């Protein structure tokens, strides 16, 4: 991620639109007052540092420190190696985990207690998620070489371990059985 790309992410996710000006005073005001913008600003900066080679400063180490603080402060654990397009948005910033094997397109809307991960550590498979995807609360996406298409809506409490085609909605049917004693 180069400097221009980082500014583009900040413009879209912190300032609220790709064509909005990136003014330092207004951006700092938003970061200080809004928790989501605070998280996204520091997460994107940490990703930028993580992908830079060591130089005068140990940028990857600085990125890991920023990431550790974000996990403690916000309860969101998105690995720095995960590739997520601009437009990341949270309904509630609690219990969100995204593995480093995730490759996610633009405009992901994610709700609380959602996990995107691989089956086992050391697996080489990636999880591809397209553009304009909406994930409900308590969604669990686990698999290797898993593909979720563009314009997909995943319902609350869904367990996804198979591919989902473009322009689909997906949910897991839950049945509550109540039997007399």
PLM region spans:
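Terminal amphipathic alpha-helical/low-complexity segments used for targeting or macromolecular assembly
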Residues: 1-74
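Left-handed beta-helix
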Residues: 74, 79-80, 85-86, 91-100, ...
């Amino acid at each position: 991620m180069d400097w221009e790309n980082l500014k583009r992410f900040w413009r879209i996710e912190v300032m609220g639109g790709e064509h909005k000006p990136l003014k330092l005073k207004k951006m700092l005001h938003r970061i200080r007052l809004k928790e989501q913008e605070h998280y996204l600003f520091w997460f994107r900066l940490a990703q930028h540092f993580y992908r830079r080679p060591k130089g005068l400063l140990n940028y990857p180490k600085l990125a890991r420190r920023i990431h550790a603080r974000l996990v403690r402060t916000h309860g969101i654990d998105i690995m720095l190696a995960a590739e997520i397009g601009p437009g990341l948005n949270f309904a509630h910033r609690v219990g969100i985990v995204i593995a480093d094997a995730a490759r996610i397109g633009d405009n992901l809307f994610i709700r609380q207690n959602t996990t995107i991960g691989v089956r086992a550590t050391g697996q080489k498979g990636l999880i591809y998620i397209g553009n304009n995807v909406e994930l409900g609360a308590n969604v669990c996406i686990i698999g290797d070489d898993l593909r979720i298409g563009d314009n997909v809506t995943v319902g609350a409490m869904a367990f996804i371990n198979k591919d989902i085609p473009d322009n689909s909605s997906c949910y897991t049917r839950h049945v509550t059985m109540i039997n007399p004693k």
